[in-house]
Amino acid sequence: MLVVLLTAALLALSSAQGTDEEVNNAETSDVPADSEQQPVDSGSDPPSADADAENVQEGESAPPANEEPPATSGSEEEQQQQEPTQAENQEPPATSGSEEEQQQQEPTQAENQEPPATSGSEEEQQQQQPTQAENQEPPATSGSEEEQQQQESTQAENQEPSDSAGEGQETQPEEGNVESPPSSPENSQEQPQQTNPEEKPPAPKTQEEPQHYRGRPPKKIFPFFIYRGRPVVVFRLEPRNPFARRF
């Protein structure tokens, strides 16, 4: 665009210079002719001399009118065209580029700086808190609970056979249990737990029930006597079932 404008301006200037030269040549050629005609025609036709003088004045006044507009118009048009082109070429890119770059850099810097720091720290803290809670709390509670359950079961096992055995045998495990608490602090903590009303020691079993008894009632023993090598039943509590299985 600038090249086209410059070429148009040069053409306008060259045309203006050409017109100026033509006007100057015309003036130089017209003035001597008038001067030559004035002395010749001065005696014969004074009105014609006046007419020639008027024509010369008109011709002199006309060329400046023709000369001035192109020069002024060309320069003004060139200036008007160059000013907006310069403004368009210089101002908008600088302002738009700088503003766009600043606007782009500001959000990118805010995104690169602010979120990672806050999000990373918060996420790390949130992750560390549950991990610490998981690593610290459950093992302590689970270990203590398991140990307590195991010790309670062992104590219950130690107490049950002693109850079924007799009084003499009961004293021995009690003495052993009394001696063990000072050696192990865990037993001292568990003893008050046994005193709770919920966890009562099991009632002593009767000796009538055999140890192998699980769920089937014991086999009844009928009174009988042996006669000629065969057992003879005195009486039967229940009538014999013919379809019953014989043992």
Curated annotation (Swiss-Prot):
Biased composition (Basic and acidic residues): 197-212
Any GO BP annotation: biomineral tissue development
GO cellular component labels: extracellular region
Keywords: Biomineralization, Repeat, Secreted, Signal
Positions of the UniProt region annotated as Disordered: 14-219
Function: GRP proteins have a marked affinity for hydroxyapatite. They may play a role in the formation of the protective acquired pellicle at the saliva-tooth interface.
Identification of the protein by name: Submandibular gland secretory Glx-rich protein CB
Native source species: Rattus norvegicus (Rat)
Source species taxonomy: Eukaryota, Metazoa, Chordata, Craniata, Vertebrata
